[in-house]
Amino acid sequence: MLPPKYEDNTLQIKEKSTERAAPFFVLEVTARSAADILGIHPNSAVLFYRKIRIVISHYLALAANEVFEGAVELDESYFGGRRKGKRGRGAAGKVVVFGILKRNGRVYTVVVDNAKSDTLMPVIKQKIMPDSIVYTDSLSSYDKLHVSGFIHYRINHSKEFADRQNHINGIENFWNQAKRVLRK
């Protein structure tokens, strides 16, 4: 299950308990709440959750070199900080995360310094095959896509959120789910 470099025999949780704890992880129940429900030591549940995250991280790293093709959605989101003050693009104290969603497939995310074209275009060219259909919002950073070998469609959120296939609802939903989980 785990790659050898992640082997750790310090976790003392019975196999039966791991089988019972795994669904709680999937349902996004906190480790401490799962421990209370299962009647195990909270530290055991925390360590078990950490091991699951390590395994997930390992397999995601193996898939990190995947190149997307076909219909993909691009968007950036801002994480961290408090809701005080400026929100959205340019919000101070927040981390910019750029995401690529393959429709009906995987999502690739990467922390970037900013959402400018010079920052995003190298990631886009590395992760998306030329001639792919790329859907974005109206951010000016995506202006170069149509001259970079991609079929580019924009959605103007001030007018509408979807126009048949022209939308970025998939990646927007991903951001919503990620932020909801991280708030826990």
Regions flagged by a language model, labelled:
Residues M1-K184:
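Residue-level recognition of single "structural anchor" positions
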